């Protein structure tokens, strides 16, 4: 008794039964017009005009014709094979059980659906439609290749005696149509009908398992694996498919066990393992396996090289990449392979060797679109935007290739950055015109573009309209929020994504939204910005559970998050646990110690970094100078500045000069800072250095140099509000209220708006935001009342408000009211009222903490007996028992 397939459904009949055949005079395919003359005269005339060789071959036997037909199919002369069949029909030679399978194979390889249907009608006419299982199996294959799932099922359902080939054809077809569950159901029915599976069956079934979501796919895959072991069917073909399945499902340990236990490892086996390792970001291990493969005497091919080169690219292992390039050059024409060429271009560009990438590109004769895309992306990621756009134009105009979604992923960022491309949004119109606007890859790129242009609302609109969002889409939108400093929105979107992922794990969806390393390294800066320590710890726990905590990018982000949430000890612990530290990791930990005022530890880390063979870069020294500045280590900072080129090989840039100006200015050595400004190379951008000098002038009330710095800054950066605010502060402190008012008026006329002071504090699962002078928070009235009470207690302890921080020329009591509404005071009050006694209060602020808030927080910490950690835009302040960790040096 046959097994009723679980996926049975009703379809309209698309194949006429013999009694319903249409007359052959209708709906003819051009090939078959010759085979259906209306009279003997037309028969001869058609034959003479279309195939004069027929008269020569009329004496040939039917067997000769059928052998001729089959030989043409074997020789891949597909169209000639069809014409041979036409000649047979004209001569009245009846096709048999051997002719139709060969003919149907030819039509399947041609992927000609219309011709296939006509031949199918002939099959019924000559009586092979139901009883000949061989012909029926070939028909299944025909409709699979022509992409007609309904026809595949219909033909299969009418096979009276299904054999192994019938089931193999069906299961293979279902996999081709990505009907993975149905393929497994068909496999079960095959077993129920006592049809013995072959190795080809198991390959298709394992492929189906690899495309099911976890844990279902893994469970089914293991069952098929066990079945193969029991039946002794595990040949190299199946082993390779199992290795690929375990790798795709993230079970690399099982892939490696299979590889180790399999004696007949061939090139395909190795390539499968290498590909799985790279897909699962086990890049160093992939390179180790490549070495083992070569030692076993297995020569890499183009698939090996193109699979492993991305590992060199991501790890920036230029030397290994060059070795693979040399191997490709040495071994035949591997370097001429388009996939290898594209991978080489990507590797060189990712290692900042753009010229080497271009040489590979120029040396390729067969430049497919993948190669063009790799070179455009290489230029774009290295910010060679002009070259990227020129190459894009050349690809379309000279090479005649049309841009696809991958092309646009490289072109769009180049357009956004390029000064020559003023109408940035016009690229969106180009995408729509090319019909690429519904492509998910392109939509992700457009979302990123609008985020970087500051139009996060348009990015969100694109995201909202997308029907098919994958993990990359969610990561892109989260990145957009983080880039635009919409940190609360980024965390909310992550929460929404996690809720959808829970539905995925319950089988409600097939698209996995499980956060990966990119998700974590993207969202952790938002936790840091909001000082959301609890959320950061939650993400850290997830990273540990999913073996992502030791990833260098995730690890570096965790180091930064803990440091910016005030947990320097935990930051160092995470740093020490990262197995492969890169220069970014070292820079982050040095910056962390600097933010906390531990300058000597930062310098010790610089030395340790050198001992471990990691060369410092430009950012390293910015971190070191910042650490020296916040710790008052002026002489040590100057010493490092003057030896950074001879001892470390790093040329001082404008950013380094700005840091050293800050170092000197913060220490009150403003004239020296001004002299250093004048020593800067003429072509350097001096905005950063002038800004440091202006800030120092504000701290030390140096009106003369402050005015010079502000005038130069406003000329260089007329739209930056902080320059006007600092100058107005200097004038206010000096009692020059008219000048302060004039600065504010100029600021207003220029359309420059001061960024409002914002502070954040985490409580429970929420991050609460406070804005200076804002009363929209639900506890606003309660907080104001508490601060008034606290104010009186502080006065009794000797607190005198520093009203020099108020820019407005108003009465002293009004200035005090304005000071009381500063955002950090509101956040601290919220923390005191909403947490239990003894709990550390952690607050983050978007601007530099003012003198009065710094003074007030010292008094508050003593009165309420709380430790208060306040992070402003520059550094950390740890208040305890009336003192601050900065020693009033900030």
Curated annotation (Swiss-Prot):
Task: Tell me where it resides.
Answer: Plastid, Chloroplast
- Assigned GO CC terms: chloroplast
Question: Which residues constitute the organelle targeting sequence?
Answer: 1-44
Q: What PROSITE patterns does the annotation carry?
A: PPR (PS51375)
Pfam families per UniProt = DYW_deaminase (PF14432), E_motif (PF20431), PPR (PF01535), PPR_2 (PF13041)
Query: So which residues are the signal peptide here?
Result: none
Where are the stretches annotated Type E motif?
A: 689-764
Any GO BP:
chloroplast RNA processing
Effect of a null allele: No visible phenotype under normal growth conditions.
Q: Does the keyword DNA damage apply?
A: no
Q: Which Gene Ontology molecular-function terms are recorded? A: mRNA binding; zinc ion binding
Q: Report keywords, A-Z.
A: Chloroplast, mRNA processing, Plastid, Repeat, Transit peptide
Q: Specify where the region named Type E(+) motif lies, as residue ranges.
A: 765-795
PPR repeats: which residues? 61-95, 96-130, 132-162, 163-197, 198-231, 235-265, 266-300, 301-335, 337-371, 372-398, 404-438, 439-473, 474-504, 516-550, 551-581, 582-616, 617-652, 653-683
Principal location listed in the UniProt entry: plastid
Its biological purpose: Involved in RNA editing events in chloroplasts. Required for the editing of a single site in ndhB and ndhF transcripts, which are two plastid-encoded subunits of the chloroplast NAD(P)H dehydrogenase (NDH) complex. Required for the editing of a single site in psbZ. Required for optimal activity of the NDH complex of the photosynthetic electron transport chain.
Extract the PANTHER family matched here: PENTATRICOPEPTIDE REPEAT-CONTAINING PROTEIN, TETRATRICOPEPTIDE-LIKE HELICAL DOMAIN SUPERFAMILY, DYW DOMAIN-CONTAINING PROTEIN
**Record's family?**
Belongs to the PPR family. PCMP-H subfamily.
UniProt-recorded name of the protein: Pentatricopeptide repeat-containing protein At3g57430, chloroplastic
User: What is the source species?
Assistant: Arabidopsis thaliana
Q: Which gene encodes it?
A: PCMP-H81
């Amino acid at each position: 008794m046959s097994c009723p397939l679980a996926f049975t459904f009703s379809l309209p009949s698309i194949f006429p039964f013999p009694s319903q055949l249409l007359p052959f005079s209708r709906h003819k395919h051009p090939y078959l017009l010759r085979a259906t003359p209306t009279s003997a005269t037309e028969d001869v005339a058609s034959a003479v005009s279309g195939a004069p060789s027929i008269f020569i071959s009329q004496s040939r036997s039917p067997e000769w014709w059928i052998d001729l037909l089959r030989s043409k199919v074997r020789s891949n002369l597909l169209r000639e094979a069809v014409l041979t069949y036409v000649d047979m029909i004209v001569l009245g030679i009846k096709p048999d059980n051997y002719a139709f399978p060969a003919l149907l194979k030819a039509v399947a390889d041609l992927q000609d659906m219309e011709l296939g249907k006509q031949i199918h009608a002939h099959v019924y006419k000559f009586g092979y439609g139901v009883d000949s299982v061989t012909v029926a199996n070939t028909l299944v294959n025909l409709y699979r290749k022509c992409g007609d799932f309904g026809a595949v099922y219909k033909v299969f359902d009418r096979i009276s005696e299904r054999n192994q080939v019938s089931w193999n054809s069906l299961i293979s077809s279902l996999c081709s149509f990505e009907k993975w569950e149905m393929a497994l159901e068909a496999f079960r029915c095959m077993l129920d009908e006592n049809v013995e599976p072959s190795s080809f069956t198991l390959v298709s079934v394992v492929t189906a398992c690899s495309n099911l979501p976890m844990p279902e796919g893994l469970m089914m895959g293991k069952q098929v694996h066990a079945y193969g072991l029991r039946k002794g069917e595990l040949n190299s073909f199946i082993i390779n498919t199992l290795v690929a399945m375990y790798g795709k499902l993230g079970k690399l340990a099982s892939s490696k066990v299979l590889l180790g236990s399999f004696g007949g490892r061939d090139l395909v086996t190795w390539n499968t393992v290498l590909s799985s390792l790279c897909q699962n970001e086990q890049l160093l291990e992939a390179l180790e396996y490549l070495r083992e493969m070569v030692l076993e005497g297995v020569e890499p091919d183009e698939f090996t090289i193109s699979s492993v080169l991305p590992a060199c690219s991501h790890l920036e292992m230029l030397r290994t990449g060059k070795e693979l390039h040399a191997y490709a050059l040495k071994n035949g024409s591997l370097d001429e392979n388009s996939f290898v060429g594209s991978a080489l271009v990507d590797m060189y560009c990712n290692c900042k060797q753009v010229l080497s990438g271009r040489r590979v590109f120029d040396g390729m004769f067969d430049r497919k679109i993948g190669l063009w895309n790799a070179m455009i992306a290489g230029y774009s990621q290295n910010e060679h935007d002009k070259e990227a756009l020129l190459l894009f134009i050349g690809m379309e105009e000279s090479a005649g290739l049309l841009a696809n979604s991958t092309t646009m992923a490289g072109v769009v960022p180049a357009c956004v950055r390029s000064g020559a491309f003023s109408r940035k949004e016009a690229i969106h119109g180009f995408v729509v015109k090319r019909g690429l606007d519904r492509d998910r890859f392109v939509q992700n790129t457009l979302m990123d573009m609008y985020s970087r242009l500051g139009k996060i609302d348009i990015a969100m609109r694109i995201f909202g309209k997308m029907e098919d969002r994958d993990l990359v889409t969610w990561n892109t939108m989260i990145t957009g929020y983080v880039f635009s400093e919409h940190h609360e929105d980024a965390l909310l979107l992550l929460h929404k994504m996690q809720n959808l992922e829970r539905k995925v794990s319950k089988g409600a969806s097939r698209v996995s939204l499980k956060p990966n390393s990119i998700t974590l390294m993207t969202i952790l800066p938002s936790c840091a910005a909001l000082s959301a320590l609890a959320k950061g710890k939650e993400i850290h726990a997830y990273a540990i559970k999913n073996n992502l905590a030791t990833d260098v990018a995730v690890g570096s982000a965790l180091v930064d998050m803990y440091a910016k949430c005030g947990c320097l000890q935990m930051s160092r612990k995470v740093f020490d646990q990262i197995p492969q530290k890169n220069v970014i990791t070292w820079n982050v930990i040095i910056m962390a110690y600097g933010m906390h005022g531990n300058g000597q530890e930062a310098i010790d880390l610089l030395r340790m970094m050198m001992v471990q063979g990691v060369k410092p870069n430009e950012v390293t020294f910015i971190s070191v100078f910042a650490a020296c500045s916040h710790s008052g280590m002026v002489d040590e900072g100057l010493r490092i500045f003057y030896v950074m080129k001879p001892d470390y090989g790093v040329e001082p840039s404008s950013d380094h000069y700005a840091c050293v100006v800050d170092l000197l200015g913060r220490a009150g050595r403003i004239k020296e800072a001004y002299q250093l400004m004048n020593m800067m190379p003429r072509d350097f951008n001096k905005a950063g250095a002038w800004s440091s000098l202006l800030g120092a002038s504000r701290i030390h009330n140096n009106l003369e140099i402050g005015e010079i710095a502000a005038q130069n800054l406003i000329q260089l950066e007329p739209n930056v509000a902080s320059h006007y605010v600092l100058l107005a502060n200097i004038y206010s402190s000096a009692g020059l209220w008219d000048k302060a008012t004039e600065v504010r008026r100029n600021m207003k006329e220029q359309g420059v708006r001061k960024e409002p002071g914002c502070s954040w504090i985490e409580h429970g699962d929420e991050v609460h935001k406070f804005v200076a002078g804002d009363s929209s928070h639900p506890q606003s009235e309660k907080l104001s009342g508490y601060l008034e009470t606290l104010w009186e207690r502080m006065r009794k302890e000797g607190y005198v408000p520093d009203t020099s921080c108020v820019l407005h020329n108003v009465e002293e009591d009004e200035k005090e009211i304005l000071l009381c509404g500063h955002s950090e005071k509101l956040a601290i009050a919220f923390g005191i009222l909403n947490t239990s006694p003894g709990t550390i209060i952690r607050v983050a602020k978007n601007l530099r903490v003012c003198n009065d808030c710094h003074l007030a927080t010292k008094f508050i910490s003593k009165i309420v007996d709380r430790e208060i950690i306040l992070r402003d835009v520059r550094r950390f302040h740890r208040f305890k028992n009336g003192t601050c960790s900065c020693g009033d040096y900030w």
